Amino acid sequence: MQTVRMTTAQALVKFLNQQYVEFDGKQQKFVKGIFTIFGHGNVVGLGQALEEDAGELEVYQGRNEQGMANAAMAFAKQKHRKQIMACTSSVGPGSANMITSAATASANNIPVLLLPGDVFATRQPDPVLQQIEQTHDLSISTNDAFRAVSKYWDRINRPEQLMTAMIQAMRVLTNPADTGAVTICLPQDVQGEAWDFPSYFFQKRVHRIERRLPTKASLADAVEMIKRKKKPVMICGGGVRYAEAAEELKQFAETFHIPFGETQAGKSAIESSHPYNLGGIGVTGNVAANTIAKEADLVIGIGTRFTDFTTASKQLFQNEEVEFLNINISEFHANKLDALKVIADAKEALLALIDELQEIDYQSSYTVEIADAKDAWETELSRLHNIRFTCQDFTPEVEGHFDENLNEYVDALGTQLTQTAVIGQINTLLDEDAIIVGAAGSLPGDLQRMWASRKPNTYHMEYGYSCMGYEVAGALGAKLAEPSKEVYAMVGDGSYQMLHSELVTSLQENKKINVLLFDNSGFGCINNLQMGNGMGSFGTEFRYRNQETRKLDGAIMKIDFAASAAGYGVKTYHVTSLEQLQEALIDAKKQTVSTLIDIKVLPKTMTNGYESWWHVGVAEVSKNQSVQAAYESKVSNLQQARSY
């Protein structure tokens, strides 16, 4: 047997260079590159291996471990899970910073390979710098926290363990049914230890992502269910994008006259203008999709996890005869809502159903309902685009909270811009193939409802974990995946302040991204939630501490985000009017470096809900009558929802 004597870290790098995926006959490298932040826990081990021979891996320098791992996830998401980035950090705080990103990737079923440094396997120098000592178990380190948020976790305590660990890692990373974060912990001493690795460990490995076919029995059951139903509705989930099944879904909708709503992950699989595309569905959905969904007698979920935002906490579907048909590559997700399961690739399942349903000449019973619903939403959308603030007699979209305070925000932020009007203008002015990236706050709701996707795969929303701080890093990841396209991070001031470190990496790599920063001086989405459930405004506006009350109810904070970003070398713009916004967007397209447009918008001018409800933990007992009323409303809505 031929062997190669290498360190564990060197063997890992050599192995990663030999991984390929094949999908629909197309073969490509699986691991594009590796994000690094070096510390004592990885620099002389994995760092040495990368310096000596990185192979074809692109080596990137992150600025924050969570940020770089978010960028890696966004890269894989934009690549439809067919290519990934790895990330390496030092031991302790560096690795802990990636835990949130691991959870984000796993919640979204997006493959990311995390390689955190770890404490010494020999324990000789214990406690090593940044080690946590657990007196009940000395084998525990910070990296054990990854177990809860990884789809596969392993620790390499001996060099020879690398082989089985990495083979299992690739199994999970290339498994469309159960992929997510894979964490391989690398004790810092073991990284540098040598072993005689067999040459066959480094052979080219092609991981074929196969399209699972539906069984004849499940297909027959699905046909029997569909032919009994008159008003079905489909839900286009992220699985449609990752399976590249958009054309088949369009064919299915057109052939059988069946409309579909979009989840956050599924949006832009098909252009918004398609006659059967109702748009966003659920809590952050629009009136068209939710109205049709309420009356549907069959819900066909295609590649969706049926989150609470998609089902409106299982209260959206109100037809007493409604049943569920789930097409999913994952048995776990297909099993939800007591559904009839078709465990299969979305494309193959749809093609098979098209053949079977055509044989029986199936057609839904919709007449004008689909067109009427879309027309109603287009009318509402036009209204949202044209909302303008007036100092007197103005009623915001989210009304009754602090309408009387809006003039204070006008003065403090120097703006009269409404969020819906800003989004409308941005949607009009961006290139058709531009990619927008979002994750948290009020923007995901506005964008799922309002954004018109004119080209496929241009809407990139992380809403499985709704991770604040994903947006800027996510934009970098999307840009690395599609460097020829303009990429825009749609981010609120709250999320931007949490994390925007990879904006600097975009400058370093000369990968231009555009940050569209919506500043309403607060956590506006959560302010809406608390006040909508009977509370006052508490801890969600960005106000100075009042020296008299000792509370955060003083003057509104105004931050010049453009000035801050300009210090990095970003091209920046200040926007307080639609005219300035248009000028900034046009000029930003001409730039070759990353840009940031600091857009001051008024709170409460985002969209509100349409025909939906969201179950949150309202206090059952309170001295506040409005909280009591909110709790009673919750109980009433729960009575209309499924129990599971």
Swiss-Prot record:
Disulfide bonds: none
Binding, Mg(2+): D493, N520
Superkingdom of origin: Bacteria
Pfam families per UniProt: TPP_enzyme_C, TPP_enzyme_M, TPP_enzyme_N
Cofactor note: Binds 1 Mg(2+) ion per subunit.
InterPro entries linked to this entry: DHS-like_NAD/FAD-binding_dom, Myo_inos_IolD, THcHDO_hydrolase_firmi, THDP-binding, Thiamin_PyroP_enz_cen_dom, Thiamin_PyroP_enz_TPP-bd_dom, TPP-bd_CS, TPP_enz
Cofactor(s) in the UniProt record: Mg(2+); thiamine diphosphate
Sample GO molecular function, one term: thiamine pyrophosphate binding
Catalytic reactions on record: 3D-3,5/4-trihydroxycyclohexane-1,2-dione + H2O = 5-deoxy-D-glucuronate + H(+)
Pathway: Polyol metabolism; myo-inositol degradation into acetyl-CoA; acetyl-CoA from myo-inositol: step 3/7
Top-level EC class: hydrolase
Any coiled-coil regions, as ranges: none
Cellular component aspect of the GO annotation: acetolactate synthase complex
Location of region: Thiamine pyrophosphate binding: 442-522
Alphabetic keyword roster: Hydrolase, Magnesium, Metal-binding, NAD, Thiamine pyrophosphate
Gene3D superfamilies, A to Z: 3.40.50.970, TPP-binding domain
Family matches, as HAMAP family: IolD
Family in the record: Belongs to the TPP enzyme family.
Function: Involved in the cleavage of the C1-C2 bond of 3D-(3,5/4)-trihydroxycyclohexane-1,2-dione (THcHDO) to yield 5-deoxy-glucuronate (5DG).
Protein name listed in UniProt: 3D-(3,5/4)-trihydroxycyclohexane-1,2-dione hydrolase
The species this protein was found in: Bacillus cereus (strain AH820)
Source taxonomy: Bacteria, Bacillati, Bacillota, Bacilli, Bacillales
